[in-house]
């Protein structure tokens, strides 16, 4: 699934204007150079856009009036709009965000010492992981840079306007929402560059996390493009189980996937030498003590910490959530091998905002529901 590289020439809107949210700093400087302006003007505008969540050129008071007028003629700052908001009893907020005639979902998760934003990268998902609600919606398209960074921009603007209520500013971003980020590299990477940029959101590379189910060629590319924290959606201790619940494993098996992870760690400073393993706990599928021993053996050569995720149900799902006692036994086995093991606290499940529950509103170009009814046919995933 290849993507055209984003440039100022291919990010114009219907009215011929360039949405500046589609441009990272290098592209923004090229844009201002083409306007006959000095590169530092790009830095000024980005600071207004991301430090102050400003989308009105007239409010950028350190930019001269002539340039502001020129910008209004050729450019705009247009983030996708929130069309629905749901608030959980635990403080989690889920926003449905309009992207064209469809919706993706973005989740704000406040904690005592941080606030994490879970961001979507695609409308739907093509990977068909059996335990994930997003995967059941099918796949429509990749999100543009402006639609990815626009989720962060919109959330930051909402949270910033609500400081009087005590909401914590966003400190962490995780690419764990709808979609597989590595199948949209050419939009995800510039968006993450803006998250890290001092004139963007200025986040530490250790506080921006990309999660992948294992698109190995793209993971190798990622290591040459950007350094961010990495989480891998493993979810199984062997290929037999993973083939069933994470079908991309049939193309890139666990051994191949973990080898790519180790290659990424060799290039990365953000991960401090270890990767986060995500492992959803499915009752009597992958949660037995024998599975824990297999997982420990599997990961012995991969420096990591392990997040055990109680499965979050959705309608018509064929699984059950592991009991607390089974999760506890599983965790103790892993810790006996010396692995740092954390049982993730479920957040936002009362508003379907928890891990694996995001669905949005997807016009399915893969016609997945129809195919499943008629043929049970699996989608073909092309390498990036």
Swiss-Prot record:
- Determine the domain of life of the protein's source: Bacteria
- Per the UniProt record, which EC number(s) apply here? 2.1.1.192
Which cysteines link up through disulfide bonds? 118-355
- Please state what class of enzyme this protein is: transferase
Key words, A-Z: 4Fe-4S, Cytoplasm, Disulfide bond, Iron, Iron-sulfur, Metal-binding, Methyltransferase, rRNA processing, S-adenosyl-L-methionine, Transferase, tRNA processing
Principal place of residence: cytoplasm
- What residues does the Radical SAM core domain cover? 111-350
Q: Which GO terms describe its cellular component?
A: cytoplasm
This protein's cofactor list reads: [4Fe-4S] cluster
**Amino acids binding [4Fe-4S] cluster:** 125, 129, 132
Which residues participate directly in catalysis?
A: 105 (proton acceptor), 355 (s-methylcysteine intermediate)
GO MF term set:
4 iron, 4 sulfur cluster binding; metal ion binding; rRNA (adenine(2503)-C2-)-methyltransferase activity; rRNA binding; tRNA (adenine(37)-C2)-methyltransferase activity; tRNA binding
Q: Reaction(s) catalyzed by this protein? A: adenosine(2503) in 23S rRNA + 2 reduced [2Fe-2S]-[ferredoxin] + 2 S-adenosyl-L-methionine = 2-methyladenosine(2503) in 23S rRNA + 5'-deoxyadenosine + L-methionine + 2 oxidized [2Fe-2S]-[ferredoxin] + S-adenosyl-L-homocysteine; adenosine(37) in tRNA + 2 reduced [2Fe-2S]-[ferredoxin] + 2 S-adenosyl-L-methionine = 2-methyladenosine(37) in tRNA + 5'-deoxyadenosine + L-methionine + 2 oxidized [2Fe-2S]-[ferredoxin] + S-adenosyl-L-homocysteine
Q: Does the keyword Transport apply?
A: no
Q: How is the cofactor bound?
A: Binds 1 [4Fe-4S] cluster. The cluster is coordinated with 3 cysteines and an exchangeable S-adenosyl-L-methionine.
**UniProt function note:** Specifically methylates position 2 of adenine 2503 in 23S rRNA and position 2 of adenine 37 in tRNAs. m2A2503 modification seems to play a crucial role in the proofreading step occurring at the peptidyl transferase center and thus would serve to optimize ribosomal fidelity.
UniProt record similarity statement: Belongs to the radical SAM superfamily. RlmN family.
Q: What else is known?
A: Reaction proceeds by a ping-pong mechanism involving intermediate methylation of a conserved cysteine residue.
Question: What protein name applies here?
Answer: Dual-specificity RNA methyltransferase RlmN
Q: Which organism is it from?
A: Escherichia coli O157:H7
Q: Which gene encodes it?
A: rlmN
């Amino acid at each position: 699934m290849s993507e055209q590289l984003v440039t100022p020439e291919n990010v114009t809107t219907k009215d011929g204007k360039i949405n500046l949210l589609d441009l990272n700093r290098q592209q923004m400087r090229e844009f201002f150079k083409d306007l006959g302006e000095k590169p530092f003007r790009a830095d000024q505008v980005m600071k207004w856009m991301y430090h102050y969540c400003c989308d009105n050129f007239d409010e950028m008071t350190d930019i001269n009036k002539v340039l502001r007028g020129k910008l209004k003629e050729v450019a705009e700052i247009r983030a996708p709009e929130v069309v629905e908001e749901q608030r959980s009893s635990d403080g989690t907020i889920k926003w449905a965000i309009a992207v064209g005639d469809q919706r993706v979902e973005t989740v704000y998760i406040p904690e005592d010492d941080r606030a994490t934003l879970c961001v979507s990268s695609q409308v739907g998902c093509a990977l068909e992981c059996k335990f994930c609600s997003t995967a059941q919606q099918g796949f429509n398209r990749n999100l543009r840079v402006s639609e990815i960074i626009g989720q962060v921009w919109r959330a930051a603007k909402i949270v910033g306007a609500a400081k009087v209520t005590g909401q914590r500013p966003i400190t962490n971003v995780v690419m764990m929402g709808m979609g597989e980020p590595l199948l949209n590299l050419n939009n995800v990477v510039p968006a993450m560059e803006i998250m890290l940029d001092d004139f963007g959101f200025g986040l530490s590379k250790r506080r921006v996390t990309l999660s992948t189910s294992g698109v190995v060629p793209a993971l190798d590319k990622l290591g040459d493009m950007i350094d961010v924290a990495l989480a891998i959606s493993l979810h199984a201790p062997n290929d037999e189980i993973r083939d069933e619940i994470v079908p991309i494993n049939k193309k890139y098996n666990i051994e191949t996937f973990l080898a790519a992870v180790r290659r990424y760690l060799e290039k990365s400073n953000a991960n401090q030498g270890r990767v986060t393993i995500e492992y959803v706990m499915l009752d009597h599928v992958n949660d037995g003590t024998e599975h824990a021993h297999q997982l420990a053996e599997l990961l012995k050569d991969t420096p990591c910490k392990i997040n055990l995720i109680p499965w979050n149900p959705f309608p018509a799902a064929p699984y059950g959530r592991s009991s607390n006692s089974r999760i506890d036994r599983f965790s103790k086995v892993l810790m006996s091998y010396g692995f740092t093991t954390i049982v993730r606290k479920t957040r936002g499940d009362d508003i379907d905002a928890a891990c694996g529950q995001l669905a949005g509103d997807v016009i399915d170009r893969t016609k997945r529901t129809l195919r499943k009814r008629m043929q049970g046919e699996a989608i073909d995933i092309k390498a990036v």
